[in-house]
Structure formats: structure tokens, C-alpha cells
């Protein structure tokens, strides 16, 4: 124990310190020297000091006044129990100290052993001979010290304050009183023993001793000249290194200031302190801070307004107060305007995100270079796929596609196979999975497909590679539960799991089922399901974990930011996660727009973002067109027929237009256009036959006769019926016997201009022995066409969203093989994706879509591999109706498609497709296009629709304008499909 002082109160406190276990060698030397000193005393070579009155230990008696010394003079006591107290001698007088100092000059300077009672050895015996046998190690007695200096022991500071005495090494005191000190010579082997416990711990952390030495060296103006010799202390060497490092830093700073002075203007003098401080502040700016300051100094007002959180008031304030010399001054000055600092923060955030995007682009450029180079090389040489069924041969372009997938697999990269519809993406995936099984990568792999294509996938696996063990996870809730129980015992034997989008994202039990597998590849067919990162479905699909992913899509990349960003994050989630937290941060960068952007500037801004996104996606997409790879594919001809509406139909249409002209409501453009489209297609899609009086009678009859309506008031039932179309009311009356007398005459199904045109076309097609596909956007229209076909006596099949999923492929196979079936009725949404109907070569689009790519998907159901006849496509348009405007808009978009050129790896460089837009299988139109179409329909003039129909199609605004209207259509369809899938029976292989 030792005593020291609390520097706040002056109170003496006891501080415990422990010996250093690493100082054993030093202790042994000292014990040997003590023994030698004791021997000399006993032999009479030295005179003993008069004995003290108290025993060994702490002496609290009267203290001898001591000479004022530095902190180095406060030493710790060492007491030898074997030495009697009367033999102790005080060698503190100045004469002996001078003699000792003379002796020290013979060798290197030695650090003094800290001791209040100095142990002095005879000069002739000062150095122990190597042959001398050391005495047994003496026990060290801990004593209390009167010293108030705790720093030399590296004890903790009291109350967080520094010791006023200073650090242990005070070099000016060493010069002044060197004669009064003895140094302990420490050789290389025992150098570490000089450091006490806390110094060892601080040295281990790499911080403590260096910090303490630098603090000590910074307080004193005079420094000790240290010679780097064998006996030099470790602390002295560290202090010198710290001092030299500090001098070098100061020298570098002075050199930079001198260089700035030389580069300054001629009239600037070194005495100009403000300029020097300004230059120092500028040197302290980060790269982004400097770029931000330069932007606010040089940008024009219109450029300022393009940035986020900058309005006219802030822009004017910037122009009035610039230039800003340093970033800090700019921030302080911008506090003078409301939300001025927010504008700076927003621009700094923009610079940060732009830097993130640049780093991502750099990563992708490396991938693009290697992928492009290896893609050219991978087309050379044969590819053996022995697991494919004998007799099944891939086309050359399909082999290239499989080789590309293998290359992406070897590079551990995700991929998007974007071949045009009809080029056999399914077959390429089956062949690729057979290759993985061939090399021992058995999976399991998960394939997620739309409900309408699940049977086609099953058929392709059995046809091309029956050796792959396929599990089809589908069916009702009870059947899926039973299937999950069965699979537990056979999990290791499954190569591929085939399921639908709703199965993956709907029920928690289904999600847990897929988590039980360590999935290798997750493959998504018809990738438009992953083109909207704002949807719940997208977020659910991204939670499906697999080592790698493949996306299949037949549609080209749209100039749509949401779609491109969604695909980017899907393909590059590992890359993006290094730079941003999730997709919302990525989305914010691309969506960041100023509040005052006009349409032109907004389009240019977003086009730049589109170019960036496409550049990122390039290495990961392979896209080929049919006209590039299928030279022998039969031709396809297209025609548009404008038909005259029947008089009652035209009168109904004109009544709707007149009502819209008189109406002041302009918000529901989508609903108004929908009413016009229904009237242009068939009058039964509106309510004209069932008058209000008939509806009252039907309502009263239902409430009187039917249990389902017994608790309802007939007035309320009548009001509900008033919102339905004629065909829906007719179908309701068919359900109940009591209302059968209110059924419509079936001949009304023939009373439309388009049905009359079918009377002209269908007989001619039938005479040629060809088959026909008829597509419609409305299931109600398909109901009317069924009545029409029954009246005319044509055999047909029908497929829409309500068709049981597992019945669909059976219907398709039956239609392709049967010679008696003549017509196939399909809804554009359900029948336009992933099905093969090459037995038909005539396509009739009964009612066109806002998006021409939806109609093109329908065309590709028969214009694809396996087609042997020329394909004829006919679009029916009611003359003088809103459909004329829709057709003009579609022509504009289809013309833009012709301007595309080939890009990397055959991918289309579809930069010209600015106005194209596609959302998850639904028809959709931008808000501005809806307004233009409605205005043209009301005025009856459609000449100006084509001129600038795409102005709002390039960005997110058009998307948001139609978002609410689209959700009203899309959500019920998705829920209905999900409910339908859960009610279907399951199959598993």
C-alpha cells in the first residue's frame, strides 16, 4: 500500500497497487545486489547509519526536509527483511551523489530504480559478475509511500483530474539533478520488466503508453536527448517517436500553407489571417460538401428548382446571398430562409445516393465486361445433355440460351431470360436443370408459375426430362396439408418443386413448407409478377430464399422506373445490400424530383435514371426475338376492321356521350371510358333492356319467393340491380324459376356491329379448315359470345380466370388435337400468358387493350414454335367510338418498337419505348392518356390523340395517376384467383 493525495480535498488516501509478475528478473537482480550490499556492510567496508527508532515499514515520524525535485525524485521503498535496520545507510548526501554521477558517466545513462531509500552499491561491485550465483529471491515488502505523485506508477487519476506533478519523465529535471540520481541499467532482455502492470495493459491496447508519453512531451519545452542504445528506456524511445511524428505533421501543414500562399493572388499577403483560415476551412471540406457548395454557387435558378425541397423563395435567397466561400458559412447563411438547411441536406443526400449508384455501376461494369466476353466464347463447342429424353433436340438458339445459363451459374450470378414469347423458355429451363442434375447439383429447385401454365410445365418436364423428380405443390388447403405430410419422408429425393404465385405468398403454412427446403435455384415464370416492387406480392416473393434466381419474361424492358428498379433489386440484391438497406432506399434515389419540374425536364431527368438502370441490368439479361432466331417461322399478317354499330347500339353510345358532356364530374375518367367501351362492344354490356319498372318487378318477386332475399326490402334490391348490365341481370334471372319470365331474347346477342362482322369472317375461316382464337377483355363479353356461337352452331372451348387451373391444359390439348373444335374463347388476361395454341392460325381481338403488348401476348399463343400455317390477326374497332382513340395510341407505341436496335447479348436496346408501360397483367393507361381519350370521345375527334399521347408515359406520375383506378380492378381479380386456386384439386408427381 502507498499513500497519495486527493487533489480536490488534499486528503491522504490509500492506493493499492500490485507487483508486476513480469518483473521477476529485475527483482532477482536487485535481491542479489542487496545481498552483496549486506555482505559489504557486515565486512565493514561501509559505515552504517544510526538505527531508526521504529521498525521496518512505513515511517510516520518526523520527516527530513528534502530538496525540491521533479516527479522523478519520488520513489518507492524497497526493504530487505534479511537486513537489520541498524545496517541501513542513507546515501542521500550530495557528495556521494556526485561520486555516483561520476561513475555513471563510464557507461550509458541508466534509469534510476524508484526508491525513496536509495540502495547504493560499492563502485567496484556495482555490476554483478556473470559467474556470481544470485541469492534466493527476496520477498518484497509493500510499503506506503509519502509521495503524492501517482502518475509515474501509471495509477488512475483521481476524480478524473491530471496529477499536478506531471508525468514520470521530466527531462529538464534529469539535466538539473542528474548528480543526485542513480539509474538502473536495463538490457534488452529485461526491458519489458521496467514497465509496471498498467503500462503492460496499455501497451497491449496500443494506446495507453503512447498517449501518456505524448501528453508529457507536449507540456515541457525542453526535452531530453535520448541516444538509441542498448540501455535506453522504452518510454524514452516512444517519447522520441511521438515527438518526431508531431514535428513531421507540423512540417507538412506548414508546407501546405506555403504552397497555398504561393498559389494565391499577387496582392495577397501572408499576414492575411482570414484568407488562411478560409483556405484551411476549404481543405477541411469533404468531397460532397465541396460539390454541394459549388452547385449552390453556380447553378441557375431553373437548376436549383429541379432539386428536392427547393422552392422559389429558397432559390431567390440562394441567388441573392451567394457566393458562399466555405460549406459551413453556407449552412449558417441558409438558416436565414425557411427550410433553407433542409434544401442543403436534401442535396447532400442526393450526392450520397448518386455516389452509391456510381459504385454499383462500377461493380456491374466489371460483370458486364466478363459476361460479354465469356458469352461470345460459350457459344463455341458442343454441349452434351444426356439426361434429355431421346429424340428431343434443342434449336441452336436454345442451346445458346442453356450455355448462357450455365455460364451465369458458374459466375454465381442471377439471370433474366427475356426471350420473346414463343421461343421456348420453358424448354431451356428444363434442359438447364437437367445439366445441374447431371453434374450432381440436384437442388431442390423451386419454379413459381402462373396458374394457367402449371399444366404446361408438368407436360414439358415429362416430355423432355422424365428423370427429374417433380413435385407439384398445388390444390385445396386440405390437400396441401396432406401433401406436406407426405413430402417430409421423401424430401431428399425431390429435384424440382413446381407451384404457383399464390401458393408461395398466401398462407403461412405454405410459406413454412418452402422454408423447410434448402433451395438452390428459385425460378419465376412470367416475370411481370416481379415488376412492381410496391406490391405486396413482390415483397412476399423476395422473401423466398434461394442461392440463385432466374426470371423468365417475354416482354421487353419498359421505360418504366418502378419496373426497372424492381428487376434491378431482384437480380442484384446481394450487390445492392452492400450499399443500401433495402429497395425503398434505392427507389428514393430514382424517384427524387424537384417540386417545380415541368414535363420536359421531368422526362429528361427520368430518362437519365432509366439509362442508368438499364446499364446496370445489361449483363444479366439475355433477350432474343423470333425474327432473329426463327427464320423459318410462318408469316404473320395483321388487319384492322372498323365496323359500323347497329342503330340501337349507336343510340346507346350517343346517350352516354351526351350525359358526359352535361356532367361536371371529371375525376372518374377511367369509369367514363369504361362505359363508352362497353357500349361500343355490345349494348348488353350496359343496361338498356331492363327498365326501372322491370327491375322493381324482379326485386319484388325475389323478395317474395326466394329465401336468399326474404329478409331484404325490395326497394334496396331494385337499387342494387340498377347498377348491373343487361347480361348480368339476365344471368341472375336464370338462377331462379320465379324470374324466368324476365329473361331476354337470345337474338339480342346478335345485335351488335362486331357480331355482324363475325358472321362474315367465321364462315370463311371454317371453309379453309382453319381454327380461330377470339380474345376479349371482358368475361361478360365472353358470355355474350357463347350465346352467339351456340346460335350459329359453332363448336368451341372457353378459358378465363374462372376456369379450374388443372382443367386448362386438358382443354388446350383437346383443342389442339380435335378436328371438330373450331373456336377457342379466351380472356386476354388468363389466356394471353404461357399457353400453346398452335393448331389455330386466326386470331380475332374482339376488343383492344390500352397496352398493345397485352394484345401481342395474345397473338403469340399461336405465332410461335410449332406453327405451320401463316397467322392472321384481326382487330375489331367500332367506328367513331373511343376505340378509335385507343387504336391511335396503340399505333404510336407499336411504331416506337420498330426503332429498337440490338444490344448486349442480343438484348434489345429499347430506349425508344418511352411511352410503353405494363403492369401486372392488367390493362392500364396513364392519367393524362385517360383524360385525352375521354375528351376525344366526348368531342368525337381522335386526330390529336396520337400526336403527344406519350408525354406522361415516361415516368412515375402517370403511374400514380391511374393507381387507384387500377387497384379497383386488380385487387378483386387477384383475390378471386387466389380463392379459385385454393379450391382446386392437387396433383403431384
UniProtKB/Swiss-Prot annotation:
Keywords, alphabetical: ATP-binding, Chromatin regulator, Chromosome, DNA damage, DNA repair, DNA-binding, Helicase, Hydrolase, Nucleotide-binding, Nucleus
Domain Helicase C-terminal, first and last residues per copy: 757-912
Binding site for ATP: 419-426
Keyword hit for DNA repair: yes
EC id: 3.6.4.12
One Gene Ontology biological process: DNA double-strand break processing
Ranges that cross the membrane: none
Biased composition (Basic residues): 109-120
Gene3D superfamilies assigned: P-loop containing nucleotide triphosphate hydrolases, Tandem AAA-ATPase domain
Localization terms from the record: Nucleus; Chromosome
Enzyme class: hydrolase
Catalysis performed (reactions): ATP + H2O = ADP + phosphate + H(+)
Locus of motif DEGH box: 525-528
Compositionally biased spans, kind Basic and acidic residues: 124-140, 201-221, 241-250, 277-288, 950-982
Acidic residues bias locations: 72-105, 187-200, 251-276
Residues covered by the Helicase ATP-binding domain: 406-574
UniProt keyword annotation of Iron present: no
Lineage top rank: taxon: Eukaryota
SUPFAM superfamilies reported for this sequence: P-loop containing nucleoside triphosphate hydrolases (SSF52540)
Major location category of this protein: nucleus
Family membership noted in the UniProt record: Belongs to the SNF2/RAD54 helicase family.
Role description: DNA helicase that possesses intrinsic ATP-dependent nucleosome-remodeling activity and is both required for DNA repair and heterochromatin organization. Promotes DNA end resection of double-strand breaks (DSBs) following DNA damage: probably acts by weakening histone DNA interactions in nucleosomes flanking DSBs.
PANTHER family according to UniProt: SNF2/RAD54 HELICASE FAMILY (PTHR10799)
Identification of the protein by name: SWI/SNF-related matrix-associated actin-dependent regulator of chromatin subfamily A containing DEAD/H box 1 homolog
Species assigned in the record: Caenorhabditis elegans
